[in-house]
Structure formats: structure tokens, C-alpha cells
Design a protein with these regions (language model features):
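Membrane engagement elements in two modes
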Residues: 1-58
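Short coil/turn motifs at beta-sheet boundaries
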Residues: 40-42, 71-73, 123, 145-147
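Beta-sheet-dominated interaction scaffolds and their linkers
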Residues: 46-79
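Mid-length scaffold segments of soluble, non-membrane domains
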Residues: 66-106
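Intrinsically disordered, low-complexity Pro/Gly/Ser/Thr-rich segments with frequent PxxP/GP/PP motifs
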Residues: 68-69, 73-74, 85, 111-138
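Buried hydrophobic-core signal for structured, non-transmembrane domains
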Residues: 79-82, 130, 152-154
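Terminal connector regions
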Residues: 89-106, 110-113, 136-167
């Protein structure tokens, strides 16, 4: 083989090799990555945050943000502003509910002010938080996979009256 033919042959092999590499990269990007993305990510869920305080407790209680967007599988912290409006120290306890109900088994409260009674001094203001995790399986369950918006509600009650079943 003469030198010119060897050069053309090497050039041809390099072009074939680069073409195959580009083709494999294209297949990887357009097939493997798209399929992988559709299985590992999910659409965010909107949480509408509602609060109320039973008339037996003279507190103000509001979410810092009334609506937040969360991604299933990510730990989320939600903050609430609370204030004792009375001139005496008072204790309250919160109950937690959500709608739609079938979503509840997919919410894990990792830390919550609602686990214990909370006491505020007269006119004291504070920030309470809840740390929660929405199980990514929520996007795969037939009863919940189409839910894109959830309402979470906390109601604060006077702790003593709540404990004594007087509410």
C-alpha cells in the first residue's frame, strides 16, 4: 500500500469512529436520559396552608407563606408566625389535617410544633415550623398520582381545655 492510500484509509477510519461516537452520544442523550428523567423526577405539588385559632385561645397564627411549592422526595420546612394577644401566658396545642384525605399517608412530619403544647408569654411573638417529607411514591399511587394541589390546615386550641375535653 502506498502512503497516500494509507492516509486516506486512516482518515476514513477516524471519520467512521467519530460518526459512531456522535451517534452513540445522540442515542444516550435522547433515549436513556429522557427515560431516566421521567422515572426519577416528578411534578411539584402546591401546598395551600390554612390556619385558624379556636376562640378559647387569644392567639394570632398565620403561615409565613400561604402557598408553597414542594417536590415529592425533598424535605420541606414550613414556617408559621404566632403571637399571644393576651396579657397572660397561655398554652396551645395544634391539630393537623389535610385535603384530599388519601394524600395523608404520603406526608411524613419529621418535626412539628403540633407534637407538644406550646406556651407563649403575654404579647410574645414566635415562629413555629414543621419539617415534612412527601413520599415520592405519591406520584405512582393510582389514588394520588393526579393530585397537584393539597390543603394543609392547623387549628390551635387552648391546651388545658383541649386536654380536659372541654372544647
Amino acid at each position: 500500500m502506498n502512503t497516500t492510500i494509507k492516509k486516506y484509509y486512516k482518515t476514513f477510519l477516524i471519520i467512521i469512529f467519530l460518526t459512531i461516537c456522535c451517534f452513540l452520544f445522540y442515542i444516550y442523550e435522547n433515549k436513556f436520559r429522557q427515560n431516566n428523567k421521567s422515572h426519577t423526577t416528578s411534578e411539584p405539588i402546591v401546598l395551600n396552608l390554612l390556619t385558624s385559632v379556636h376562640p378559647s385561645l387569644s392567639w394570632s397564627f398565620k403561615p409565613v407563606k400561604s402557598k408553597i411549592i414542594v417536590n415529592p422526595g425533598e424535605v420541606t420546612s414550613i414556617e408559621y408566625m404566632v403571637e399571644n394577644l393576651s396579657n397572660k401566658a397561655t398554652s396551645g396545642i395544634a391539630t393537623f389535617s389535610y385535603y384530599p384525605k388519601q394524600f395523608g399517608s404520603f406526608i411524613s412530619k419529621l418535626n412539628c410544633f403540633c407534637y407538644d403544647a406550646q406556651t407563649l408569654k403575654p404579647k410574645q411573638k414566635d415562629i413555629y415550623s414543621i419539617v415534612l417529607l412527601i413520599d415520592p411514591e405519591v406520584t405512582k399511587d393510582s389514588k394520588t398520582k393526579n393530585i397537584k394541589e393539597v390543603t394543609i390546615q392547623f387549628i390551635f386550641f387552648d391546651y388545658k381545655k383541649f386536654k380536659d375535653n372541654k372544647i
